[in-house]
Amino acid sequence: SMKRERIYLFDTTLRDGQQTPGVDFSVEDKIVIANMLDEFGFDYVEGGYPGANPTDTAFFEKKRTVKSRFVAFGMTKRAGISASNDPGLAALLQANSDCICFVAKSWDYHVRVALGCTNEENLESIRESVEAAKAAGKEPMVDCEHFFDGFKANPEYAMACAKAAHDAGARWVVLCDTNGGTLPSEI
């Protein structure tokens, strides 16, 4: 018999959709939309970035889905601070969510310029953030930001970022084409 593959659906309307010009969800808007997405049957509903703004922080004071896994989005811990002392990571761990989706740099250029740390420090931030989420009982996932640009520049390092996330226990490692410039033939 044919093996049936399971496709998991992840909705990011409440986080990435909110970055659309002219869109500014209130907490009430987010609650209504989360209920609709939950009823539609999405496996995951990404609710926003707790700690980044008052709306998202308030939205994560309660779990807002019944069937769907409720996802908090945020950055990996900063280099030079322990996981237990990083306020951004603390906000994610305290959010009433089932999962944490970490956005992680996977392009060595961004590690150097945006994060101002070494490649190894970034790998450590990925590992320790995923481990902290797991220890807190959250399902960890990692968005490897600008993965394909990073892969073109330094394939070994981009893959090392994805592998660090996987080996630390991330349930999902997402290879993001952040700029949307990668053609199917290149993958």
What are these regions (language model features)?
Residues R4-L9, R15-D16, T20-V45, A52, ...:
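Alpha/beta enzyme core
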Residues R69-F73:
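A glycine-rich helix N-cap at a beta->alpha junction
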